[in-house]
C-alpha cells in the first residue's frame, strides 16, 4: 500500500526516524552503527511511504496532496491541527467539519484515513476510555469515524519513583468494521516506536 504521512506537530525528520525504527526493528543507536543494514531492512517499504511536513496547512491542502500522490493510506498526524476555526461559533464545530472533510477525502480518493487526535484531561489517569474523552469534541469527530482506538496508560503510582510504566491499553471504543469493542493491553517499546504484546 502507498502511504503518506502528513505531520504538523513534530518535525518530519523525527516522525521519519520513528517509522524507520519501527519498520527495521533497530533502535536509532543501532541504525547509526549499521546504516547499511537499516537501509536494507527499510528498502522494501521506502518507496511506499512518504512523510511530509504539514505545519500550518489545512484540509484543502491535504486534499491536493491526495490528488497528487494518490495514496492508499493517509495519516493525519495530528488531524485536529488541520482544522480552521474561521466561520464557526465553537471549536467543536470546526473539528467536526474537519473530520467530515477527512471522511470525504477518504471516499473521493478511495484511501484509508487515519486521523490522529489527542485525549482530553478527562482521560488522565484512566485505563478505560470512551469517545467523549477526545480533546475538543463533543460527538462530531466520533460520528465521522469507522474505527476509534484510544490509547491509555496506567495511572501513576506513588512508589514508582522515576520508573516509566510502559504498559498501554488500546481501547477499541467504536468499530463499524467488525463490531468488536474492548481493550487490548500491550507494551510500548519506545526505542522502536512500536506497541508490542
Regions found by a protein language model. Give the residues of each.
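Structural recognition of the conserved hydrophobic beta-strand(s) that form the central parallel beta-sheet
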Residues: 5, 75-76, 111-118
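Short, glycine/acidic-enriched loop or turn micro-motifs at the edges of active sites
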Residues: 12, 80, 121
Amino acid at each position: 500500500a502507498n502511504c503518506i504521512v502528513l505531520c504538523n506537530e513534530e518535525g518530519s525528520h523525527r516522525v521519519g526516524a520513528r517509522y524507520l525504527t519501527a519498520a527495521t526493528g533497530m533502535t536509532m543507536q543501532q541504525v547509526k552503527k549499521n546504516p547499511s543494514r537499516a537501509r536494507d531492512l527499510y528498502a522494501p517499504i521506502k518507496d511506499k511511504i512518504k512523510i511530509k511536513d504539514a505545519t500550518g496547512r489545512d484540509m484543502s491542502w491535504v486534499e491536493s496532496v491526495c490528488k497528487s500522490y494518490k495514496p492508499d493510506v493517509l495519516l493525519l498526524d495530528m488531524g485536529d491541527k488541520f482544522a480552521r476555526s474561521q466561520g464557526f461559533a465553537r471549536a467543536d464545530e470546526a473539528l467536526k467539519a474537519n473530520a467530515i472533510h477527512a471522511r470525504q477525502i477518504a471516499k473521493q480518493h478511495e484511501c484509508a484515513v487515519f486521523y490522529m487526535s489527542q485525549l482530553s484531561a478527562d482521560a488522565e489517569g484512566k485505563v478505560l476510555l470512551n469517545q467523549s474523552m477526545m480533546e475538543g469534541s463533543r460527538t462530531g469527530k466520533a460520528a465521522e469515524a469507522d474505527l476509534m482506538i484510544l490509547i491509555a496508560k496506567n495511572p501513576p503510582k506513588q512508589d514508582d519513583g522515576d520508573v516509566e510504566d510502559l504498559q498501554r491499553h488500546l481501547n477499541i471504543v467504536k468499530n463499524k468494521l467488525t463490531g468488536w469493542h474492548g481493550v487490548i493491553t500491550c507494551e510500548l517499546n519506545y526505542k522502536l516506536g512500536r506497541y508490542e504484546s
